[in-house]
Amino acid sequence: MEGAELKKFYETHLESGAGVSVLTADAPNPFGYGRILRDSVGRVTGIVEEKDASEAQRKIHEINTGIYCVEMPLLFTLLENLSNDNAQGEYYLTDILAECLKRGRDVCGIKTQDFDMVMGINSRRQLAQAQRVMNERIVGRLMDEGVTIMDPSTTFVEKGVKVGRDTVLYPFTLLEGETEIGEDCVIGPNVRFTNVTVGHGSSIQFAYAHDCRVGNGVTMGCFNHLRPHTVLSDHVKVGNFVEVKNSTVGEGSKLPHLQYIGDSDIGSGVNMGCGTITVNYDGKEKHRTTIEDNAFVGCNSNLVAPVTVGRGSYVAAGSTITKNVPEDALAVARGKQVNLEGWAKKHREK
């Protein structure tokens, strides 16, 4: 329920001078709700619960939303006189209306025209229905603010999320928590963000990220996972099948595909070859890897932390690096290739 509606309800209650006000609504299917009882001139005389209602009363569509406004001193007086003489054997808060009338105070029934806003939730079906209604309102507001949502029925956005103008959300995008997306972004399909900040002009698809920051102009391909405390600076490229955890990636650096980057500090202009891994765990503790600006790490390399790859240096493909690499150096850490000519032919002839 929106705060503006509650404020309107409260102000109407004060204007009425009633001892108790109840917010009501017309329900398409009133089954399970308490019914509002009115006299011949439309004044509220009470509320009857489903199990206590007569056949005629069950045909009433005006229902109790469970939202009341009551003077505090009067409320305690009314509560003292409640009885559990009903089919449920329970004390009904709704009985305060009848008690209020007995004391000569008016009861005001204030009807809202928006049943969806006040629907009761007593089952998982009703919970799903309420979530759908709320999501429709949130994505509708975003579209009114200039966000393009390709399919509102398959895009899910929580209330605290912010999305900038001219951003496009593709189907099966789920934005949760305090996520904030900048302007001119393309998000989705199949993206889930929880507490993620994304700058302007970024394009991300098929990804799961939580508790991290993504800069401006970042591109992310398919099947990537950004874990907590990850920071991708502006114009970083993340390809396919990449996991980044508790790491900072500098401006313009590239993580093209098939990589695990954990507990690392990567400078700007760095290229990480396919299959490169930062080996951060020794079985007991996590250690950090540092890769300085403009370094080039070849494919299928293992960087065993703690280790530093110096500025502008190269790591040859297939290397396992266990020692620091100096600035502008080439590090090669792999077995020397040996060709045994004719070996395969002899092996086949055995």
Regions picked out by a protein language model, each given a short descriptive name:
Residues 1, 7, 11, 78-79, ...:
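Catalytic cores of nucleotide-enabled group-transfer and carboxylate-activating enzymes in metabolic
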Residues 1-41, 65, 69, 77-82:
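Conserved beta-loop-beta/alpha segment of the NTase-like Rossmann-fold superfamily
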Residues 15-20, 31-33, 41-44, 64, ...:
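Short coil/turn connectors at secondary-structure junctions
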Residues 23-24, 47, 110, 324:
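Generic beta-sheet signal
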Residues 36-39, 69-70, 121-122, 158, ...:
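Short beta-strand-to-turn element immediately C-terminal to the catalytic PLP-Schiff-base lysine
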Residues 45-135, 140:
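Catalytic-core segments of class I nucleotidyltransferases/pyrophosphorylases
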Residues 148-332, 337-338:
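Structural signal for interior beta-strand "rungs" in well-ordered beta-sheet cores
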Residues 340-350:
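Short, charged, intrinsically disordered terminal tails
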